[in-house]
Amino acid sequence: MRLPVNRSLFIPFIVAGDPSADLTVDLALALQDAGADVLELGVPYSDPLADGPTIQRAAARALAGQMTLPKAIQLVADMRKKGVKIPIIIFTYYNPVLQLGEESFFALAQENGADGVLIPDLPFEESGPLLELSERFGLPLISLVAPTSKQRIEQIASAAQGFLYCVSSLGVTGVRETLPESLGHFLGEVKRHSRVPVVVGFGISTPEQVAMLKDACDGVVVGSALVQKIEQLLERLQTLEEKNAAIAEFASYARSLAAPLREPCSSR
């Protein structure tokens, strides 16, 4: 996976199929135009253990529209045809991968132009077989590291591929007004052991929070705030006369979240 160098990464997350497959492609293009460096494409799942209510509702909408793991992966090829050039990470729970078949999953992801995979409910200790497949197919398996994993940070960081995803706080995803005071120390500890870029997600939802974190890590992931914006724009996105204006409003919102990362860093 080729990542930009000498700049903080803006990594947005959206749910495949919310509100539709075609609109997911349009929103991906809008995010690229807004300055996204990597796109996390979430695969809807009926029991999303790591996700809060905003992403759960988005997943329910996508599942109601018959979105599946294979269809979500095929959306990557559609995005490539429409001009999305940034790396795309498939974010999926393990059960759909198991149902499809692990090798089939990696083969399909590679065939359709994905750049990596992230499986939030896959324990690091059980990731060996998938790490072998990720190496064979050239698709990094992105690792998650949480604040409870201090003894395991060095172990997880040593095996990290692509980038290392730090979970800002325990619990599910979702918009948060404040971030833990200990987050800076945690990120510093992870960076000391990591050979790949260190990004942080879960709960980052305002430009002020992005600005606060940019010197402590190599990038931020914003998910629930963007999915919430899509939810607010649902009716307009699905109205022919208002679709383009709604996409432009979404892009403007994403740009405001990325903006602090484009300002000079005080210490990197």
From Swiss-Prot:
PANTHER family: TRYPTOPHAN SYNTHASE ALPHA CHAIN, CHLOROPLASTIC (PTHR43406:SF1), TRYPTOPHAN SYNTHASE, ALPHA CHAIN (PTHR43406). It comes from Geobacillus thermodenitrificans (strain NG80-2). Pathway: Amino-acid biosynthesis; L-tryptophan biosynthesis; L-tryptophan from chorismate: step 5/5. Tetramer of two alpha and two beta chains. HAMAP family: Trp_synth_alpha. Belongs to the TrpA family. The keyword Lyase applies. It comes from the Bacteria. This is Tryptophan synthase alpha chain. One of its GO terms (cellular component) is cytosol. The gene is trpA. It is an enzyme of class 4 (lyase). The alpha subunit is responsible for the aldol cleavage of indoleglycerol phosphate to indole and glyceraldehyde 3-phosphate. Its EC number is 4.2.1.20. Gene3D superfamilies: Aldolase class I. The active site is at E40, D51.
